[in-house]
Structures are given as structure tokens and as C-alpha cells.
A protein has these predicted regions:
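Alpha-helical transmembrane segments of multi-pass membrane proteins
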Residues: 1-13, 205, 215-240, 255, ...
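Membrane-interface junctions at transmembrane-helix termini in multi-pass inner-membrane proteins
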Residues: 9-31, 229-259, 274
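Hydrophobic alpha-helical transmembrane segments
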Residues: 31-46, 53-82, 259-263, 277-298, ...
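Alpha-helical transmembrane segments of multi-pass membrane transport and lipid-handling proteins
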Residues: 46, 182-233, 265-266
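Interhelical loop/hinge segments that connect adjacent transmembrane helices in multipass membrane
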Residues: 54, 58-62, 77-109, 176-179, ...
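Helix-terminus/linker motif at the lipid-water interface of multi-pass membrane proteins
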Residues: 109, 113-154, 171, 211-215, ...
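Helix-loop junctions and terminal segments of transmembrane helices
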Residues: 152-177
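Membrane-proximal transmembrane or re-entrant/amphipathic helices at the cytosolic face
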Residues: 328-377
Length: 377
């Protein structure tokens, strides 16, 4: 009940945020979001400090959320009207809006439901495979609470890239600027591959150490090291889904999502007996590979201008292997002569620099791309 008023504030703010995004006004978009988060944290800390019970603390946190949503709603409304925004009759836009929004809404809603199903199935299948209840829950906690956040690092950069490229992609598509659209798609795909291929070797070489340093958990580190290669298909799947959604293929990406979700559920059901807790990660990777392949196929099929990305992607993927070997050698060298923390920092810095030089030498990256990525992210 406490959170119900926040639904109104957040719904209206989401519309204004969408308008800011579509009009490429990224600075107010980001500033208002940042202020909302800061208000939520500050008010939450202030209110929780006086709680008398767990239930009272939960209520106070809910009030902090409502307050932060009210702040973002107020700031966005002020900005909207100060910049000349006006209210209009939405009925003429209802049909195209629903046609575009329903598939994406279906994906988001279904994703939450599927995650709920997985959270019920996975422990049961792990226990059936021979784990105790405590071991199963501990393993799930390590994967979902420790390893996956680290493996999601590329998603931050790619999400920022998608945020600023989607309006440009949509504009070029609906104006029929197919040449510029092709260039946008190629640039997005190549930058995504470079980001993933730059991070994978670092996680492979330093994954076990990161698990110890960040969470004091060796199993977390082993999972990061063994599963870091899934970042390439997951990153490409993420950016290609954003590309297709921006040019009117929301129904297709929704269908691909359900195919990938089916693969995830199958892995979650059948694989725990063979690979234990890694079944969840295998399901995520399988879903990403399927979505990635289907998305790329649709992009190639529907593009008026031929999109060239396969050679660049394959060479990027192959380039990961020698850099991983270099990272492992550097890590072993530095760990033998200095404490773990400085060894990890030094290895990571040298490895990222060497990887960047290697990619530039192979002609896979251009200096202007690095500037573009930093500017847009």
C-alpha cells in the first residue's frame, strides 16, 4: 500500500524519460536518474537508522522509495514544461504504441516469471542430483549473488552504448537512411565485440583472484574464470536485441526470447545431474547463443545494405586466446613476487593495455572508436 502512490509518479516519469531518450537529451536523463538514486539512498539510510523492528524497517525503506520517485517525477515535470513541453491527446498514438510496447512488455514480464520458475526448479534439481539443501542454496547464492554480477560487467558499457545509439538507429531507419543505418549497426556490433574481447582475458586470468578479493570465496572465482567466455555471445545478443527493437522488430525478438528461455529451462532441468550449479550458467549461455544467432540472421536478412561483421567478430574471438595465455603468465609472475591485490591491479592494467595494442595491430579497432565509446558510455 505504501508503494502504490509511487506507481503513478514512476509511470509518468518513465514517459518523460522516454521523451528525453528519444530526443537524445542524455544529460538530463542521466542527471535525474542519478538524483533519484542518491535521494533513495540518503532517505533510506536516514529513515532506517530509527527503525524499531524488521517490519518497521521495511516500511521505512518503502517510504524512501516513494520519496525518491516523487523527486524524479517533480524534476522531470519541471524540466519538461520549462523546455516547452505540452500535453496532447494520446488516442491517435495508442495503436502503434501498443504494437511496439506489448512484445517488449511481454518479454520483461515473462523474464520475471521464468526467473521465478528457475528459482523453484534449480534447488529441487540440485537436491535430486545429490546435493544437500544447504549446498544447493549456497551454490545458487554464489552463482547469482557473486559470480553473475562480475560476469555482467560488459553489460554496463554495452547498455550505455545501446542507450545512446537506439534513437539514432531508429531515426535512420524511419527516414530510410539505409547507408547510415548500416554504419550504425556495424559500429555497434564491432564495439560490442571489442568490449567483450577486452574483458574476457582479464576475467580468465584474474577470475579466481577476484573471487577471493571481492567475496573471499574461491568457488566464485572459479566460476568467473570458467564461464567468462559466455560474455561474447551474451554481449552480442544484448546489443542486437536493442538494434532490432529500435527498428520495429519487437515481435521477432520476443519470439527469439521465448526460444532462448526454453533452452534455459531445459538446461536447468536436465543438466544439474551432470554439471551441478553450472547448469544455470549453461542455460543463460545457451539462451544467449540462440538469441545472438537468430538476431544476427534477422539483421542480415532485413538490412537493405549488406552489414559486414562476421570477419571482425571471428578474428576478435580468436584473438582472445593468446591474450588469455599472456594474462595467465603475467598473473603467475606477479603473484610470486608481490601481494595479491597489487599483483591483480598490475596484471589487469598491463593486460588491458596489451589487449588494446593487439587489437589495434590486427586492425580490429580504431582510435576514434575508443573515443566514441568513452563519450557515449
Amino acid at each position: 500500500m505504501i508503494l502504490l502512490p509511487a506507481l503513478t509518479f514512476n509511470s509518468v516519469y518513465s514517459v518523460i524519460r522516454g521523451a528525453l531518450w528519444g530526443n537524445k537529451k542524455f544529460v538530463p536523463y542521466c542527471v535525474i536518474d542519478l538524483v533519484e538514486e542518491l535521494c533513495m539512498i540518503a532517505m533510506g539510510v536516514f529513515l532506517v537508522s530509527g527503525m524499531t523492528s524488521v517490519f518497521d524497517g521495511a516500511k521505512r525503506i518503502a517510504f524512501a522509495i516513494v520519496f525518491s520517485y516523487l523527486v524524479s517525477f517533480t524534476l522531470s515535470m519541471i524540466y519538461f514544461f520549462v523546455k516547452g513541453g505540452k500535453l496532447a491527446d494520446p488516442r491517435a498514438q495508442m495503436k502503434p504504441l501498443l504494437a511496439s510496447a506489448l512484445p517488449i512488455t511481454g518479454m520483461r514480464t515473462s523474464s520475471s516469471l521464468i526467473n521465478t520458475v528457475i528459482s523453484l526448479i534449480l534447488p529441487a534439481r540440485l537436491i535430486a542430483a545429490g546435493m544437500s539443501s544447504a549446498e544447493a542454496m549456497s551454490g545458487i547464492g554464489v552463482v547469482m549473488g557473486m559470480s553473475m554480477p562480475v560476469l555482467s560487467i560488459p553489460a554496463t558499457l554495452i547498455g550505455s552504448l545501446a542507450l545512446v545509439m537506439v534513437p539514432e538507429l531508429a531515426e535512420n531507419f524511419y527516414r530510410g537512411n539505409h547507408r547510415q543505418l548500416k554504419d550504425n549497426i556495424e559500429k555497434a556490433l564491432k564495439l560490442t565485440c571489442l568490449v567483450a574481447c577486452a574483458i574476457i582475458p582479464a576475467l580468465f586470468a584474474l577470475g579466481e583472484d577476484l573471487g577471493v578479493l571481492l567475496f573471499d570465496n574461491e568457488e566464485c572465482g572459479r566460476i568467473i574464470k570458467r564461464c567468462c567466455f559466455m560474455l561474447l555471445p551474451t554481449s552480442i545478443s544484448m546489443i542486437t536485441t536493442s538494434i532490432l527493437n529500435s527498428v520495429g522488430y519487437e515481435k521477432q525478438t520476443c519470439g527469439y526470447f521465448f526460444i532462448g528461455a526454453a533452452a534455459t529451462l531445459l538446461c536447468t532441468w536436465f543438466l544439474p545431474a551432470y554439471i551441478g550449479i553450472y547448469a544455470q550458467i549453461a542455460g543463460t549461455a545457451a539462451s544467449a547463443v540462440i538469441s545472438c544467432a537468430l538476431n544476427l540472421r534477422l539483421i542480415v536478412k532485413k538490412s537493405k545494405e549488406k552489414v559486414r561483421f562476421l570477419k571482425h567478430t571471428l578474428i576478435c574471438a580468436v584473438s582472445i586466446l593468446p591474450v588469455c595465455l599472456l594474462g595467465a603468465l603475467l598473473r603467475n609472475l606477479f603473484v610470486s613476487v608481490m601481494p595479491l591485490f597489487p599483483a591483480v591491479i598490475l596484471t589487469g592494467a598491463i593486460l588491458l593495455a596489451a589487449d588494446a595494442l593487439f587489437l589495434f595491430a590486427l586492425g580490429l579497432a580504431e582510435p576514434k572508436w575508443a573515443k566514441l565509446l568513452v563519450k557515449r558510455s
